[in-house]
Amino acid sequence: MLQDRTGSRVPQVTFHTRSGHEWVDLTTDEIFAGKTVVVFSLPGAFTPTCSSSHVPRYNQLVPMFKEHGVDTVACVSVSVNDTFVMNEWQKTQHADDLLFIPDGNGEFTEGMGMLVEKDDLGFGKRSWRYSMLVRDGVVEKMFIEPEVEGDPYEVSDADTMLAHLAPNAPKPMDVSVFTRDGCPFCVMAKEALRNAGIDFEELVLNEDYTEQTLRAVANAVPQVEVNGELIGGSEAVEGWLKERASA
């Protein structure tokens, strides 16, 4: 039976981490004392949902969390993996702004009442998927995935946590910019977005996508897409930004 530990202190645990070529012990007091921390925990590094959805969205929303008073966003990928696995996973996720914490012995997870058996998958003991908001070592809110078969991912996501922390905060936009090297109009579009304070992901022709992909969208770069809607090239972006500013 999973435990909702809202109102309780987090377990006192020492995590054994690896930094460079040295072992570094990290205590829960060092992570949580006097700080506001968002924690999300998951079954395992490099697993599908964790790698494609859970970690990337928290990583994307780190600036939003910090804007609303969060000191640290921790993937206590208390996924019951060791520090070597967690360090490599962090690299592949390009998630330097997240704190990846290995709970190799499952002590923190067990203390949180979230340790479950995954023997049917050959995983052994793992963390159930959940997230929590912790202030000065005390759990203020937990979002625990329902106890159903499979790997539910309904309430522990970054957007749910952000909505709890800052209900009136505007939802961040998902912006992609398709570019190519040496394109001055691409530079203009990116600069316009930066000046408007809009974060975006850049996709470079022949590195991140092909001519065939571009032709499916348009005949030239740059192309800017926002929340699934194609805005267009640099002039269209300027017009969209002006319209947005006057709204």
UniProtKB/Swiss-Prot annotation:
Residue ranges of every copy of the Thioredoxin domain listed in the record: 4-170
Example GO BP: hydrogen peroxide catabolic process
Enzyme class at the top of the EC tree: oxidoreductase
Gene3D superfamilies found in the cross-reference section: Glutaredoxin
GO cellular component: cytoplasm
Pfam families according to UniProt: Glutaredoxin, Redoxin
Catalytic activity: 2 glutathione amide + H2O2 = glutathione amide disulfide + 2 H2O
Keywords: Oxidoreductase, Peroxidase
Family matches, as SUPFAM superfamilies: Thioredoxin-like
Sequence ranges assigned to domain Glutaredoxin in this UniProt record: 163-247
EC number(s) stated in the UniProt entry for this protein: 1.11.1.17
Recorded GO MF terms: thioredoxin peroxidase activity
PANTHER family, A to Z: PEROXIREDOXIN, PEROXIREDOXIN-5, MITOCHONDRIAL
Primary role: Catalyzes the oxidation of glutathione amide (GASH) to produce glutathione amide disulfide (GASSAG). May play a role in GASH metabolism under anaerobic conditions as a sulfide carrier necessary for cytoplasmic sulfide oxidation.
Name of protein: Glutathione amide-dependent peroxidase
Natural source organism: Marichromatium gracile (Chromatium gracile)
Gene: garA
